[in-house]
Amino acid sequence: VFAPGVDHHVYLYELSGNFVKGWDVPKSDNDIVSKIYHFRVDGKDYLVYADQYRLYILDRKGKERVKVSTLLNLSGNTPLYLTRQNGQMKIAFSDVNGEIVLVDFRGRVERVKGEKMVGGGILNVEDINGDGQDEFVYSRKDMLCVYDVQGKLLLEKCWENAELSFPYVYRFSARDSRIGVMDGKGERLFLLDMKDVSKGFPIRGNSPFSITFGDKGNAGFYLFAGSDGTHLLKYRVLR
């Protein structure tokens, strides 16, 4: 269990509560603003996390494996993603200005600035169109956008006065992935592909939702969501 401390050290415990022997107890320069992630790339293990200004890439013992010299500017609760771009594995995240930052496992940094992407949004990274490369799914207030690695705008949707949540991705098949997002203000749930909102949506609901495949004679996809804090809603998804 990884435990970042107020002293900026990262401690590692066994489930018994004892310290893990051999752990180097690394220290960040500032408060850590991400979770601590384990990525495995080309047979090597990487432990990755960030503070407000730096990205740390360590080995399994807590020693620096890759040095990232470029200074960053990150907000609290920044998610980090492992992504494949042009056949190369990279770490992706967004900074306070809304730029997408890509860091490879040699410590090299590149930035992607998407049209209409500004600070304060929420980023997800998934292969939406099935081309083998991840796209960047970005929600902010009433706007949902999808960008490619060059920052080209592939999809834009805007719902007036909405307050959109994290943009989840649901995979129905190898060629059918869709984005699901909640409008917390309007208590609506949206599901859409790279062209338009799916048939029958938006639907009522005010929680993140799950989509599962039915069994025992109930073949098809079903959506489960909360409503009013006390009800569970079940919908059948028409493809």
Where are these regions (language model features)?
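Extracytoplasmic/lumenal domain signature
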Residues: 1-239
